[in-house]
Regions:
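Beta-strand-rich N-terminal accessory domains
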Residues: 1-47, 51-62, 66-70, 215-236, ...
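Hydrophobic residues embedded in beta-strands of well-ordered beta-sheets
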Residues: 3, 21-22, 89-90, 123-125, ...
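Acidic, contiguous internal or C-terminal segments within carbohydrate-active enzymes
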Residues: 5, 96-98, 102-147, 151
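Asparagine-centered strand-capping/turn motif at beta-strand->loop junctions
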Residues: 14, 127-133, 244, 292
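Active-site pocket scaffolds in enzymes
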Residues: 43, 228-293
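Short solvent-exposed loop/turn micro-motifs enriched in small/polar/acidic residues
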Residues: 51-53, 73-78, 107-111, 155, ...
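Extended, loop-rich substrate-binding clefts of extracytoplasmic carbohydrate-active enzymes
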Residues: 65, 69-120
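Active-site/ligand-binding surface loops and adjacent short beta/alpha elements
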Residues: 149, 153-234
Length: 293
């Protein structure tokens, strides 16, 4: 089921299937990728309790539990419940108490709330992760919104760019195409020009663009030379992934709290970069904002 939230500047739709966006519209223009099974059927999946992938889809935890999780975790494939809806805010909930089968692969009782709040021409997305168990709970959380690119007919993908808040000079780490895991010793030249990342389908011929060393906490998708577009602000997320398919008319700009297993990491979940740990009954919150310019 879909729920709509709107004000005078922006309208969004959120589905109980995956708990996330199916539409972000302003001034009669759709900004969110609408999904195409022949290219990428996703739109804005929520990554939980991992971001990216684990080596052999499995890991151990300090508590001795075996975790078995497919890429990006299970939250994006579950049916969520509407928790609340008001004039400018709605919240979706996924809880292990409603689906005990989730505990077989991730043995940590949890409640995950995705809260969507309209603020003028922006929507603030907050992920609230609560440890409902009696042990420390390791986890990762991240967003994966895909935006239409180009936005208008007659435009080319290469007409667009991502403008970062700051210059990002660090070389980029590389994902191994066959596994999606990260080789930290094999770094590639940063394709940015100053503060901008020119977009082209060739940029994604082999893998996503992974900013594991990142100064910016804000990035804007827009046509070259124009100010209008979509701005993503992601304070609290240490990593940013930029991804598309070579044949896809979209670009995913993904604030992540963690990364796929790296070549210098073992298979203990808490040893992975960016791992968050919630104490029993603790709620950890991470947020990002999508603003239409």
């Amino acid at each position: 089921m879909e729920y709509t939230l709107s004000n005078d500047s922006i309208s969004i739709k959120v589905s109980t299937a995956g708990g996330s966006f199916t539409s972000i519209e302003a001034d009669g223009r759709e900004y969110l990728w609408q999904g195409d099974p022949a290219v990428w059927s996703g739109q804005a999946p929520i990554c939980f309790p991992i971001c990216g992938g684990l080596r052999d889809n499995s890991a151990m935890t300090f508590a001795g539990h075996h975790v078995k999780l497919a890429r990006h975790g299970f939250a994006r494939k579950q049916e969520w419940k509407l928790l609340s809806q008001g004039k400018n805010e709605l919240a979706m909930c996924l809880a292990s108490e409603d689906n005990a089968a989730l505990l077989s692969d991730y043995p940590y009782p949890f409640k995950l709330v995705a809260r969507y709040t309209l603020e003028d021409a922006a929507v603030r997305v907050s992920y609230e992760v609560t440890n409902e168990g009696t042990e420390d709970m390791p986890f990762f959380i991240g967003g994966h919104p895909g935006f239409r690119c180009p936005l208008d007919e007659g435009e080319a993908y290469t007409d667009y760019e991502l403008r970062f808040e700051k210059e990002e000079a660090a070389e980029l780490c590389t994902a191994v195409p066959s596994t999606g895991l990260i080789d930290v010793d094999k770094r590639s030249k940063n394709p940015m020009v100053g503060k901008t990342l020119p977009l082209s389908h060739e940029l994604f011929d082999f893998a996503e663009t992974i900013f594991d060393v990142l100064e910016s906490r804000q990035v804007t998708l827009s046509k070259k030379g124009e100010d209008k577009g979509v701005r993503l602000s992601f304070e609290g997320f240490p990593y940013l992934i930029v991804w598309s398919k070579p044949e896809g008319d979209f670009v995913a700009v993904e604030p992540w709290g963690g990364l796929s297993t790296c070549s210098d990491e073992d298979d203990v979940l808490e040893h992975k970069r960016g791992c968050l740990v919630a104490k029993p009954k603790e709620t950890v919150v991470r947020s990002f904002t999508i603003e239409i310019l």
